[in-house]
């Protein structure tokens, strides 16, 4: 009798322990973030103007400000964890941080293994021209027979070279081709819309944004699947930050335009 009773108690104990472990494992990420008091944010820290360190060693940038605003809406503080891009998705899946704020494109492939916030930036390839240039290039096709500056080895170089007839000039980076464009040695240049907005905002060169070319690329904040409460909290925070103008203010601070709205 005593042995049978002991077995029942042991079984009950094991069931209880298993249930407690399963419950703890199933705890929504929102509960963990609230209990901890911080939202752990993965980013590179070497990707201006989105995230990089200032001379004082503090992380600054568009994504840094966005992450801080989202964390504040959740009632916690942002805690940043820097990591190389090559390992950032793996770091998220391993639980090294709760979310990533590093211009992660929302793609069908990534959505198979991750959940995403609503998009908070929209980018595409974009032309840039001199301010005094009255020509209106609406597509890469319009640049046939013209000189187009791009950075060597980029997808923008490949995009430009895919259109026959464009005189593609390659450069080590944006500063070099922007100087040549301003000097009249190029008809236009091609780069990422967000990067060009940042460069033109912070440059004294007489340049202006041109037409968007190619499809729009939305970016969002990814996190691990299986956290419905956290997903709703993130979604609600993003909606509020868009509605109260916070996203627009942050965007204007870094780019001089609103990159948080879909490209028209």
Residue ranges and their predicted role:
Residues 26-103:
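Extracytoplasmic small-molecule ligand-binding "clamshell" domains
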Residues 64, 80-90, 135, 154, ...:
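Short helix-initiation/N-cap motifs at beta->coil->alpha
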Residues 65-73, 147, 152-154, 218-257:
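Extended ligand-binding regions for polar small-molecule ligands
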Residues 68, 72, 77-142, 208:
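Acidic, polar ligand-binding/catalytic clefts
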Residues 87, 104-112, 159-162, 180, ...:
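A ligand-binding cleft/hinge motif common to bilobed small-molecule-binding domains
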Residues 122-129, 193, 197-239, 257-264:
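Periplasmic-binding protein-like
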Residues 155-168, 207-210, 238-264:
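Ligand-binding clefts/hinges and TM-proximal coupling segments of bilobed small-molecule sensing domains
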């Amino acid at each position: 009798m005593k042995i049978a009773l002991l077995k029942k108690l042991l079984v009950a104990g094991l069931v209880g322990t298993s249930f407690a472990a399963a419950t703890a494992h199933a705890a929504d990420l929102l509960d963990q973030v609230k209990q901890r008091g911080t939202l752990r944010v993965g980013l590179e820290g070497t990707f201006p103007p989105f995230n990089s360190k200032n001379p004082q060693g503090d992380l600054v940038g568009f994504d840094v400000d966005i992450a801080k605003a989202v964390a504040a809406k959740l009632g916690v503080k942002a805690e940043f964890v820097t990591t190389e891009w090559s390992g950032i998705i793996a770091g998220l899946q391993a639980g090294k941080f709760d979310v990533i704020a590093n211009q992660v494109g929302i793609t069908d492939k990534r959505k198979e293994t991750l959940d995403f916030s609503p998009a908070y930036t929209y980018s595409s390839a974009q032309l840039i021209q001199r301010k005094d240039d009255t020509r209106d290039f609406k597509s890469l096709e319009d640049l046939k027979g013209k000189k187009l500056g791009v950075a060597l080895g980029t997808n923008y170089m490949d995009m430009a070279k895919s259109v026959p007839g464009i005189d593609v000039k390659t450069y080590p980076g944006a500063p070099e081709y922007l100087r040549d464009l301003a000097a009249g040695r190029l008809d236009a240049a091609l780069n990422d819309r967000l990067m060009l907005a940042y460069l033109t905002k912070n440059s004294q060169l007489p340049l202006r944004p041109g037409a968007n070319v190619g499809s729009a690329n939305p970016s969002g904040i990814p996190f691990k699947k299986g956290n419905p409460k956290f997903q709703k909290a993130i979604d609600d925070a993003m909606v509020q930050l868009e509605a109260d103008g916070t996203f627009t203010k942050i965007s204007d601070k870094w780019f001089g335009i609103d990159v948080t709205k879909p490209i028209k």
